[in-house]
Amino acid sequence: MTLSGCLHLDNDSQKIIDDTEEETRVFVTNSEGLSVELPPLPLNFVFSDVGEDGPEPSIGITSSGCIFFIALEKPMRSCDHGLTWNNVADITQAPFTSDPYGWVDPVTDRVFNIHMMGLESTWIGWSDNDGGSWLGNPHDSGPIPLNDHIKLATGPWVDEGYGIPGGLSPIYEQAVYFCYNKLLGIFCHTSFNGGATFEVGGQIFGLATGDGGLHGAITTAPDGTVYVTPRVETPAIIFSKDNGYSWETRTMGEDVGTPYPRKNSEVATDSDSNAYHIWTGGDFGIYLSRSTDSGDTWEQESARISPIEVISTTFPQIDAGDPGRIAITYLGSENSSELGGLDIDGQEWDGNPHYANGNVSYHLYITYSLNALDANPIFHTVRVSPDPVQIGSICLNSGDCRDIGGSNRNLLDFNDLHIDKDGRVYVAFADGCTGVCATGNNSQPEDSRSKTGAMYYLGSGPSLFESVGNLVEFGTNI
């Protein structure tokens, strides 16, 4: 990717033209994805090249402002707003990875560097000084073997279930959750000692026992509710209100469904513990369901986040600040002229990224809403990448990837989005179209096989925390 620095939005960028490749595209839409006559938010995003391969990255930001971008076996750190990056792993950390994940505890600043070692176990490392030094447990997972799709997160203790002994722990003030799939089951464990070991937990009951074991990230709310999203046909969430001792399930989104193959749905919670669940719908738009009672009930009429001009999407991610203030990222395509044409299997293409032909290109989009809890929320979307992130199909089913000048599974399974303590948004993604692919006039899918780690963050614009107001670019005197 050739872009660096800020993407500055102007009034001309609001013009919507089908199948264009202009650098900046801006949309202001309602809950049906339709354009509304409102001014766009003043969103300026800054790009950073991490300088290493970075498929399925995780991102987190400590209170000091250090950014951690974890992909493959390398915990990359930048403490100068993405100007420079360094691999800060030491000998206590995993030497290789079969599946990476990273997490920054927003309360304690503990940085977790997590790696699946084959399917046998998980090597969990952690740092309490911005990656200056690390500790680690090379065998820190539940029953073995076949532990896959690992995830970790932290959250507050409650006064029920595992929270009763956990709240008395003098070792670490937060609960640490570790989830993975084993065949058709999702297993989640709770740690009383900051992730050094996981003493309690097991297979989650409900949807996770018989409807597929793959799942999205773990999300926690300020009130202690924990969410896990199963990768299932009907959008659903699994949640616990007792620090993982017991779990319940809820479904939503039957009005829009999901595609096949499908990737993870994701949940975010705001400062009042309202929850926002997003997923790719059956028409390949990004959809939202909201809960205002800590996951007990969810609205059954889904809201469309992505503009209708974006006809194919994957890899949605979300985070939230104060009530109604959310940010979402995803990969998407506006090549609507390819709908109904032939896909890579010679069948009629319906927008599924897994089967997209070489005339379809995918960009990175970031969407903001500052009133997402309203009856009529407004979504502000920016296509931030000036050139494609991927040309042609994106493998969404590891058993059906294609060799088109190399595997189209170069991006792997997900991107990531998190906010810092000031409500500034950071997006981690893998760029599959760099160098000649990005600058060429006729780049093809076989040119789009890189997996370069990259990041966008909000340079200036509204914080997701209302009290912060508008953020300015780092180094700006106000």
Show the residue positions of the predicted features.
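Secretory targeting signatures
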Residues: 1-20
